[in-house]
Amino acid sequence: MNGKRRQAGLVLGLVLLFAIHASCSAALAQEPTDWVTKFPREPVRVSAWPGGKKVALSFALFVEVFGFGQGPVLRPDLMSRNPDLVNEAFRQYAIGAGNPRVARLFKELDVPLSIVLNARFPATYPAVWKEFRALQPAAPIVAHGMNNSNDILPLGRGLAEQRDYIHRTLDLIASTTGVRPTGWSSPSVYSNGDTMQAMAAAGITYNLDQMDSDTISRLKTPDGTLVLLPYPTVTVDMGQFLARMKSANEIETLWLDYVLELASEARADPAREATTVVIGLHPFVVGTPDGAAAMRRVLSRFKKEEAVWLADTEAILKAARAN
């Protein structure tokens, strides 16, 4: 009797073990889920970029409009003034002098630049936009909402409103620039699952809201698939400049360390996947003479780095699809 019980217990144990194994295997077989949107997200495997490069590096300049009295602040202690001439001058200088200066620098050094554009910018600053676009006529345009202050994504108001907002943004950019963007960057990197689904439905194919990886991934929304290009939090110049009080020279060091370390890792392990970095630039930081000088040194150094491929966002997307 005891022998039969032991045999039955052994059989039951094996059945339970098999069930647990099967359950674990099924769980592992499921696609990973994006931690924000809860949509399936999978890596895009890239062994190497064109020319055998291992680090794809793109610089994206944020060409934004805020409205008088709104936007980034250099001197919070002076905000109570009316008019706040110091902080408004900080913004207007960046818009009128900073944007063209960055465009000229990238043209001079023959480095690809991507434009992350608020839809209202060309009509609000037509002369600045004309000068800027003449310097960078072929740079891809990434949609960046209507403006960067009081007309941003309507989060929390449902999918339909986000769809309408994205369509209006794309329509306005198309009407003022002649280009209908296929890339998107949410104003202030503030988006959710509805945003991703709405942009896929609108024909957007890639976005710059991914801040948690060194490699490209693919997000599967109910209305289509989006390619997520890595846009690291720590490499955004504006955050380092205003929130962490870093100078242009300090940001220069950060960028060099960040990208060259990825290149060093690739040399140490040639079999590792190729990586991608999209660095966000703002004219408040790199559009001043000292900021442009730091930017010049950064670009000159990266042009000499054999492992780094300098490309715009659309070139990276095309190369990733070819892998």
Which stretches of residues belong to each language-model region?
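Active-site clefts of carbohydrate-active enzymes
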Residues: T235-V236, G280-F284
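Catalytic alpha-helical scaffold of carbohydrate-active enzymes acting on polysaccharides/glycoconjugates
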Residues: E31-G183, S188-V227, W255-I279, G287-N323
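N-terminal secretory signal peptides that target proteins for export/translocation
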Residues: M1-Q7
